[in-house]
Curated annotation (Swiss-Prot):
This is Small ribosomal subunit protein bS16. Residues 139-149 have a biased composition (Acidic residues). GO terms for molecular function: structural constituent of ribosome. Residues 119-131 have a biased composition (Basic and acidic residues). Keywords: Ribonucleoprotein, Ribosomal protein. Belongs to the bacterial ribosomal protein bS16 family. SUPFAM superfamilies: Ribosomal protein S16 (SSF54565). One of its GO terms (biological process) is translation. The keyword Protein biosynthesis does not apply.
C-alpha cells in the first residue's frame, strides 16, 4: 500500500486549518486517515505547527511519501533534516514569546496603583503642610498688628 503524509482540511470557509495525516495515496483529500500525526494552522501569527516527531520519523522510515506542503512543514520543524541526517535538525520553527501570565500582570497593575496612591497621599500631605506653614506665617503677622491697637 502506497502511503502519503498529507494535509486533511478542517475548519470553516475562509478559515481553514489542517491535520497532518497518514493516508493511502488513493483516498480522497478529506477521507479516512490511517493515523493523525499533527496539526497546522496557517491563520495564527506565526503559523501553528504541531507534529509528533516520533511518529513522523516512523512513517518516513517505512516509506510514506510527504506531499510538497507537508515536506515544507517537516523542514520547518526539523523532522526532514533529522530523517535525512542533515545538519540543522533543529529546524526553523518560530514560536511566540510567552507574555507575562495573568497573575503577573495583575500584580504589576496593583503595584502601579499602590505607587500612584502613595504619590497622591504624599502630594496631599505636602500641600497640607504648605497650607499650615502659610497659615502660621500669616498668624504672627496679624498678632503684632493687634498689639499695636
Amino acid at each position: 500500500m502506497a502511503t502519503k503524509i498529507r494535509l486533511k482540511r478542517m475548519g470553516k470557509k475562509f478559515y481553514a486549518f489542517y491535520r497532518v495525516v497518514i493516508m493511502d495515496s488513493r483516498t480522497k483529500r478529506d477521507g479516512r486517515a490511517i493515523e493523525e500525526i499533527g496539526t497546522y494552522n496557517p491563520n495564527t501569527q506565526p503559523s501553528t505547527i504541531n507534529i509528533n516527531s516520533e511518529r513522523a520519523q516512523y512513517w518516513l522510515g517505512v516509506g510514506a511519501q510527504p506531499t510538497e506542503q507537508v515536506l515544507n512543514l517537516l523542514k520547518i520543524t526539523g523532522d526532514w533534516q533529522k530523517f535525512k541526517g542533515l545538519d540543522g535538525a533543529e529546524g526553523t520553527l518560530k514560536t511566540v514569546e510567552a507574555g507575562p501570565d495573568a497573575a503577573a500582570r495583575v500584580e504589576a497593575v496593583e503595584a502601579q496603583a499602590q505607587k500612584l496612591k502613595a504619590a497622591k497621599s504624599e502630594a496631599d500631605a505636602k500641600a497640607k503642610a504648605e497650607a499650615e506653614a502659610a497659615a502660621t506665617e500669616e498668624a504672627p503677622a496679624e498678632e503684632p498688628a493687634a498689639e499695636a491697637e
